Each structure stands twice: as structure tokens, then as C-alpha cells.
UniProtKB/Swiss-Prot annotation:
Keywords recorded for this protein, A-Z: Nucleus, Transcription, Transcription regulation
Its biological purpose: TFIIA is a component of the transcription machinery of RNA polymerase II and plays an important role in transcriptional activation. TFIIA in a complex with Tbp mediates transcriptional activity.
Entry-linked InterPro entries: TFIIA_a-hlx, TFIIA_b-brl, TFIIA_gsu, TFIIA_gsu_C, TFIIA_gsu_N
Name this protein carries in UniProt: Transcription initiation factor IIA subunit 2
Cell compartment(s), UniProt: Nucleus
Source organism (scientific name): Ixodes scapularis
GO-annotated cellular components: transcription factor TFIIA complex
Keyword Metal-binding in annotation: no
GO biological process, one term: RNA polymerase II preinitiation complex assembly
UniProt-recorded Gene Ontology molecular function terms: RNA polymerase II general transcription initiation factor activity; TBP-class protein binding
Parts forming coiled coils: none
UniProt xrefs under CDD domains: TFIIA_gamma_C (cd10014), TFIIA_gamma_N (cd10145)
């Protein structure tokens, strides 16, 4: 099973909009569009698990809320700093969703933040 977390990213939204347009023009069927989205889910999860080598660290000023439901952790953090080598990015609020997928945790940083506290 592949999680559908990344459909809500810029790439995922653009893909869905393009597929909707193709369906409306009659160039593909809704069934084919669904197959494309399912393949996207598998491919993006695989790529993030196996190809991304960059590491970053983050530190939160405050854990606002957390919950665990159906093997999915959700954390809402406030006053967060992300650091990668020499670059520092600050966020007012970050939501992290972590799903257990075959012993690998996938993270989604979403909706998040105003850069540098703006």
C-alpha cells in the first residue's frame, strides 16, 4: 500500500489538474487517471525513501498537539527551525504526518509556515 500524502503537494496537485483536464477533453478515462495517480503514489514514496540523500535537522520551540491513530502519527509544532548544513529556515507552525510503511517512516511537512517568522 502506498500512502496518498504527496497528492497534496505542488507536483501532486498539478498532476491531478492535468488529469482532470484530459478527462474533460475526452482524451483519457477516469479509470486511467486513477491508475496514473496510484502509480504516482508508489513512485513518489519509493523515490523519497530510496533516492533522497540530503539530511536536515529541526528543532521546535513548542509541541502544540500530537496524536496517534491507525498507525499514523500527527504532530503540530510551533516556532520551528530547520537546518541543512549552513542554511537555516524558520517556521511559525509545522504539521508533520508520519506513516509506518514497511518499517520506513515517511514524513510530510505541510501547510505550514511563513518563512523566517514573517
Amino acid at each position: 500500500m502506498s500512502y496518498q500524502l504527496y497528492r497534496n503537494t505542488t507536483l501532486g496537485n498539478t498532476l491531478q489538474e492535468s488529469l482532470d483536464e484530459l478527462i474533460q477533453c475526452g482524451q483519457i478515462t477516469p479509470h486511467l487517471a486513477l491508475k496514473v495517480l496510484l502509480q504516482f503514489d508508489k513512485a513518489i514514496n519509493n523515490a523519497l525513501a530510496n533516492r533522497v540523500k540530503t539530511r536536515l535537522t529541526f528543532k521546535a520551540g513548542h509541541l502544540s498537539t500530537y496524536r496517534f491513530c491507525d498507525n499514523v502519527w500527527t504532530f503540530v509544532l510551533k516556532d520551528v527551525e530547520f537546518r541543512e548544513v549552513q542554511e537555516l529556515v524558520k517556521a511559525d507552525k509545522v504539521k508533520i504526518v508520519a506513516c509506518d510503511g514497511k518499517s520506513v517512516l515517511f514524513f510530510l511537512f505541510s501547510s505550514l509556515f511563513s518563512l523566517y517568522g514573517k
